[in-house]
Amino acid sequence: METIVLMKNDNDGSPFLPLAADNFKKACVVGPFIENPDTMFGDYSPTMMTDYIVTPLAGIKTTQIGSDLLNYEEGCTDGPACEIYNSNKVRTVCEGVDLVIVTAGLSRYLEHEGHDISKISLPGHQMSLLTDAESASGSAPIILLLFNANPLDISYAKSNPRFAAILEAYYPGQEAGVAIANVLTGSYNPAGRLPNTWPASLDQVPDMINYTMKERTYRYFTQEPLYPFGYGLSFTTFKYSDLNVASTANTNGEGSITVSVTVTNTGTMDGDEVTQAYVKWDNVAEAPNIQLVGVSRKSISKGQSITVSFTIKPEQLQVWTDDDKWSIPEGTYSLFVGGQQPDQKVSVPSNVLSATFKL
């Protein structure tokens, strides 16, 4: 459950999840992942014991979602590749429901060691799966569950108000259905964060023959992504205050920078917060645009304030120079501490504090 990322939670300006399950007594669950145990596991997974695997559909069946009517249909008879797709079956099960849950994504057969994906669009007819479920279900809200490792172009769901929630589950393993059910119903408050930058389009991704670091990873990315590295929502809210920075570090690699900040759970639920510390070099040409230098995940009860601390070592501030050697630049550094990267258009509803220090 700890890796699940809540990417969208917006129902006409209000949070949609967690579900008040008894409000959605008629539901449908569609897509190639609902009852396909193999798709719950990524590359290099151990041998599966299928008797112990809880699929997403099995997990949802343990809740009150669709207590009067729970329709389901994979739609794609060839799994996530979804080259063989039955639109009529998907549309039929989505008619007249109060809630739609769509599963989409990749699999270890579409992305694995020695087989990178060549595009970030949903494979096969999965985009038709989304639009069929949407058009057949009237005005019912839609939850998109994603199962993948590589970033995908889900801009349609991100910008579409019918898609009230998006959850990134990755390849969650044998208890997948239990984890998903717990998040949907609020038994667990998600706090996963994206470990990579999700480009808005393939045009933002450099060609593989370009060996520079320009636009590669969050450290050198200068464009507006679909979702930034380190992003992830919560069912509660957090506020940062009282940032303190003290430095004994120098450019010889001695000493350290100590950082402390107060984090307050200002919402109505207990939850984990992932505090992130980033550094920017001022006027250092060889340096990345920004770099993560500290991360801490802490459970914080509603109304509680805690102190989160980091120790930054000088070697974390090294850059590779034009002289082909590592060097710790002398000068001013900017530090940002919060639940996300600073200055991101797609952001979580918490503040980011900043300070400077010198070496």
Where do the protein language model's features map onto the residues?
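Secreted, periplasmic, or luminal enzymes acting at the cell surface/secretory milieu
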Residues: 1-43, 48-55, 61-63, 147-272, ...
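Glycine/threonine-rich flexible loop motifs
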Residues: 38-39, 104-123
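A short helix->loop->beta-strand "cap" motif at the edges of active sites that frequently abuts
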Residues: 67-68, 136-142, 161-164
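An anion/phosphate-binding loop that grips the pyrophosphate of nucleotide cofactors and donors
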Residues: 97
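Short acidic, flexible loop segments centered on an aromatic residue
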Residues: 268-287, 292
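Intrinsically disordered, low-complexity Pro/Gly/Ser/Thr-rich segments with frequent PxxP/GP/PP motifs
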Residues: 284-320
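Short glycine/proline/serine/threonine-rich loop/turn segments at secondary-structure transition edges
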Residues: 316-332
